[in-house]
């Protein structure tokens, strides 16, 4: 049986070879093909042999038909292979688009939570101002009432002295005359006076309002996020489209600049940290490049190889916002913040802004924009070339965010870190000047 199978499957050989001979009638050539048995046979087999009555055809014609089937199979396999390759490409592209979309959604959330914190801070200030105003008005009423009582005491003391003098009069006639003159007033003074009981001023309505507000938020946040999103009709509508995973996260307008201006600062630059080939304006707000270095001793904090400069004052707590004008800075600029421990000597990564753990920055060079920290970089794709950057620092929250002010406060990048030292505004120049505008 194995021999027959081998013979049946063996390719056709030239005349005289074993593969051309009928396995049943070995003296005859196997010039036909039995379709039912799948074997090459001779002309006698379908008439007198074991393949009698079976459908047969010429072996050469069957070989042509099989070759066409093989070609069709190969073409089908190639098509399916291309389809699977296309599927892989589509999946990889969808994965990359999902990563970009996830990053933009997280940036959007960072922006929204920053706005929320700013709004809550503003609400806290308003609530405290309400308490202060109510307290001052009530204290003013208390003071006026106390002054009235004091004046009445003075009147009573004066009247007591007069009555006591009448009682000491030795002449009965004069005593009675004096008594008659003061009898009416004495009767008035002898009537019981009213007692003043200040009504306590209650701030419970304010406290209860914000207590219920916090409890409502807390109760909402106790529900798992996926449940909250399913229950939200807006999220359900957003989720109706299945073309993009994570479609629940929507891009919204940029935050209002006024929210940040409440924390506005105008940091001046420190000439002692400035590279020798940089020049600082008299107000300390504009720095530009110079062909010549400065003469005289080199201060220890000065950058000796990189055209960098730090702010004069650092921020070790709270929220701060400043802006940087880079419209004339040319093809390259670096804007960020740094610890005072940033290395000042040499041009190694330990001294370059954004290339170490001591500094963070947004960089532009030759139409490309990047965010740098500790040697790690993220590509930025602003909608337009930023001419003025807004820098927002929330020290306790560990947020350092950059915005395109002229582009409607569109978000550029946010760094998250547990800050360990004061942060100083930091700049690095390539060719043109960089300025820090005065903010209201």
Swiss-Prot record:
> What is known about the tissue distribution of this protein?
Expressed with high level in spleen, thymus, liver and testis. Expressed with low level in the brain, kidney, and skeletal muscle. Expressed in various differentiation stages of B-lymphocytes.
Q: Could you say which residue ranges form the zinc fingers (B box-type)?
A: 17-59
Null allele phenotype: Knockout mice have an impaired herpes simplex virus type 1 (HSV-1)-triggered antiviral responses and become highly susceptible to lethal HSV-1 infection. n addition, TRIM14-deficient mice are more resistant to inflammation compared to WT.
GO CC entries:
mitochondrial outer membrane; phagocytic vesicle
Q: Does the keyword Cell wall biogenesis/degradation apply?
A: no
Q: List, for all copies, the residue spans of the domain called B30.2/SPRY.
A: 247-440
- According to its UniProt record, how is this protein modified after translation? Ubiquitinated. Undergoes 'Lys-63'-linked polyubiquitination; this modification allows IKBKG/NEMO recruitment to MAVS. Undergoes 'Lys-48'-linked polyubiquitination by RNF125; this modification mediates its degradation via the ubiquitin-proteasome pathway.
Binding locations of Zn(2+): 22, 25, 45, 51
**Which keywords are on file for this protein?**
Cytoplasmic vesicle, Immunity, Innate immunity, Membrane, Metal-binding, Mitochondrion, Mitochondrion outer membrane, Ubl conjugation, Zinc, Zinc-finger
Recorded hits in SMART domains, A to Z, give: BBOX (SM00336), PRY (SM00589), SPRY (SM00449)
Compartment annotation: Mitochondrion outer membrane; Cytoplasmic vesicle, Phagosome
Q: Which PROSITE patterns match?
A: B302_SPRY, ZF_BBOX
Database matches in InterPro entries = B30.2/SPRY, B30.2/SPRY_sf, Butyrophylin_SPRY, ConA-like_dom_sf, E3_ubiq-ligase_TRIM/RNF, PRY, SPRY_dom, SPRY_PRY_TRIM14
The UniProt similarity line reads:
Belongs to the TRIM/RBCC family.
Record text about domains: The B-box zinc finger is responsible for inhibition of SPI1-mediated transcriptional activation.
What is the protein named? Tripartite motif-containing protein 14
Origin species, per record, is: Mus musculus
